[in-house]
Amino acid sequence: MSVDLKQQLELADYLGALAVWCIFFGVLFILSVIFNFVCIKKDDDVTALERWGYKKNIDMKLGPHRRSMVARQIPQTVVADH
């Protein structure tokens, strides 16, 4: 009498790990945006999430600061023509 311990995995088994990964990072993103609005005050520095959104030209507010305020606090890179 022998017992076969070899598992037979299907596609749905592999997609479970992908679903957990997507849910985890989705919740992490939502929590970081909520913390940006709740814990960061208007007189604080611009957050990394706001800088990223400004550089990628995303048309949504990712923190408590206005777009003009974010633009003033980001160092502008000047490309010199040779």
From Swiss-Prot:
Keyword Signal: yes
Protein name: Neuropeptide-like peptide 36
Superkingdom, natural source: Eukaryota
Sorted UniProt keywords: Cleavage on pair of basic residues, Signal
Keyword Signal recorded: yes
